[in-house]
């Protein structure tokens, strides 16, 4: 296979038996109508979805609209728009719910559980709360505030 650009390489990979059509196999490129109901915001390059699990109030997922498998492959305009989205999201979540700060992560590990991985850039956003959040009379606590969200550590 001769390719002078990465784009040509990906085109060739998509045509091969090994690669299959990457976009057709990508869960983010083929998001179900059921999951699209969580849409919060849509920009030129990114889509913001409310996470279906609200273990952290305001938890969202920001998804790149085009198929792209790694952060270094982002274009300058995509980086700039992501930066502006981060600023806008944090201001909103701090104003509306009084979040102390937000954890941002781009974890691509689950894609590689498949024999034919098909990673797609998406960013997980977990607002963190020092104080209780009250919504419609219900109180939500961030019992792990000050600790990594996956530590399972809770304060008494």
Predicted feature residues:
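HIT superfamily nucleotide-processing domains
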Residues: 2-156
């Amino acid at each position: 296979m001769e390719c002078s650009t990465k784009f040509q390489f990906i085109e060739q990979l998509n045509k091969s038996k090994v690669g299959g059509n990457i976009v057709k196999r990508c869960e983010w490129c083929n998001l179900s109508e059921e999951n699209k109901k969580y849409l919060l915001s849509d920009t030129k390059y990114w889509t913001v979805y409310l996470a279906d699990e609200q273990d952290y109030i305001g938890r969202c997922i920001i998804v790149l609209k085009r198929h792209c498998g790694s952060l270094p492959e982002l274009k300058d305009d995509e980086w700039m728009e992501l930066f502006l989205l981060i600023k806008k999201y944090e201001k909103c979540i701090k104003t509306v719910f009084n979040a102390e700060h937000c954890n941002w992560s781009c974890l691509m590990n689950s894609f590689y559980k498949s024999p034919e991985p098909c990673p797609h850039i998406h960013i997980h956003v977990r607002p963190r709360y020092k104080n209780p959040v009250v919504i419609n009379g219900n109180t939500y606590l961030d019992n792990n505030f000050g600790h990594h969200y996956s530590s399972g550590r809770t304060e008494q």
